[in-house]
């Protein structure tokens, strides 16, 4: 759980206080929700019990950023960001036998279904391929957390030509996934929506796990 202030004046309302910009709030979202935490964002009402207009404005802008970048459904807006994982061909190095653990579970939007490897297989690769290069900025992964946090180390690479690979965000710690991990592929939470990368392929290599790795959700934006 991450408790945070949206405003400058403290936990309660203070006259003349300002609110953090929508971009700063989005950064906070990436650094909390995107790192396997619950964000409790304090937005204090004024002395009349009303949220100040500047607070409402920035929160509405934050909603648009989440909608346009991470496909949060916001009523009244146009179509959200396209989940590029849903239009990719996905190949995996190993699929668990004896059950319904197929790769399609990664993109079905159901937290109760998941892809996994066989017992004893603690590493794996997941490769997404597109017919034409796609501009990618974020990777979202979720483990079926009721079965434990398993993944200990992973690496992300992309290929623009489909043959040569370049590691993404090499300086970012990629040691856990947990309930939800949102990774800005340029490695920056403060400027995550930069130019993006033209990718024909995206590869996630799980290097080590506490037990056979499992993933319930995989999204690319």
Please tell me what each predicted stretch does.
Residues 119-123, 134, 145-221:
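Trp- and acidic/polar-enriched beta-sheet ligand-binding modules for extracellular glycan
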Residues 44-46, 142-144, 207:
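Short strand-loop junctions, especially beta-strand C-caps/beta-turns
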Residues 27-29, 126-128, 142-143, 203:
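Generic recognition of flexible, low-complexity loop/linker segments
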Residues 2-95:
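Carbohydrate-binding surfaces of carbohydrate-active enzymes
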Residues 33-35, 132-135:
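Short, solvent-exposed loop/edge-beta patches enriched in aromatic
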Residues 62, 66-133, 144-150, 170-177, ...:
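Disordered, acidic Ser/Thr/Pro-rich linker "stalks" and the adjacent N-terminal cap
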